[in-house]
Amino acid sequence: MKRKIIAIFSVIFIILVFVCTGIVMQLNKRIVQNPEGTVGNTAGNLYNGGLFCEDDGYVYFSNPYDNYALYRMKPNETELEKLIGTETGSINAAGKYVYFYQKGSGSGEGFGYVISTTGVYRAEKENPHNISCLDRVLSENIVLADNSIYYNTASQQEGVALKRIDISGDNKETLLDYKVVPACVNNSTLYFAKPVENGHLMAIKLGSKKASDILSEDIYMPIVEGNLVYCIDIHNNYALVCFDLTSGEKTVLANERTDMFNVSAQYIYYQTAGDTPQLKRVSKDGSSSEVVADGAYNSINLTSQYAYFTKFGAETPVYKTPVNGAISVTTFDAAKQAVLDASKK
């Protein structure tokens, strides 16, 4: 009798072990959802390649000193750590995960090495070798909004399109059949400049497939903050301007022809064109314009501490200046040193 009871309890125990193991495995596979209003990176950073992304106390960045492998660090450039050894861009981050577009095969070194396949990827921040390809496509831009990734694609079969996919990799769908730069998300709405017919500001509500004309002005690189739209005015010599969507008022922030820009809490960093190009910054109301550096620069990415940029046509060195403090241009030596230190191990 006692042996029979022991046998029964043993069977029950084994069953419970299997059940608990299955539950744990399912929980580990479950993709943690983001709260409504989540946006994976700033529009300005994504327009400039999405090479830097700040989230939850860390800055995730593509390190050009290491073939654009994915690294992370504290905003003050301490605690540098290599996460993924492939060439990455259009970085987004929120909650448990970091999302990115994989461009190439990279060096194949480091935690979380990914096979040489371009596409949209999701990786765990604290366990970067746990990585998933959400869609193997040719793309240029992706943005995380709530629990979906919006991204553009190009293929011989489908042409160009704007697509959406859940962060789990499910429910992929085509939203628009023309090229869109998905970068600017504000108030549960994706904003973009229409690439065909005109450059009007368009908007598509998250979860919708219908795009609406918001502003009948030909613009480029719209960054929406509340009711304000910072952008480049195509028919005003590509000047840097701000539109008030409520009143319709336009404010010229900088008359110089502008190639690209990015917006911080206090300043707008912008690159001028012409015979004497300069990287400059101006207060968001259009006052206090000042030169950051002479010459042509691009890849203007901003964090809470620094503005990062590189010379046009060059990958390194990466320059930086305090994003909201006094201008003091130096080089991003910590990124280079991290690669050198890793090579000695």
Give short role names for the model-derived ranges.
Residues 1-17:
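N-terminal Sec-pathway targeting helices
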Residues 32-44, 78-84, 128-134, 170-176, ...:
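A short beta-strand motif characteristic of beta-propeller blades
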Residues 45-54, 85-95, 136-146, 177-187, ...:
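Repeated scaffold domains used in trafficking and secretory/extracellular systems
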Residues 67-71, 106-121, 157-163, 197-203, ...:
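Structural motif
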Residues 74-78, 123-128, 165-170, 204-209, ...:
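Short loop/turn segments that connect beta-strands within beta-propeller blades
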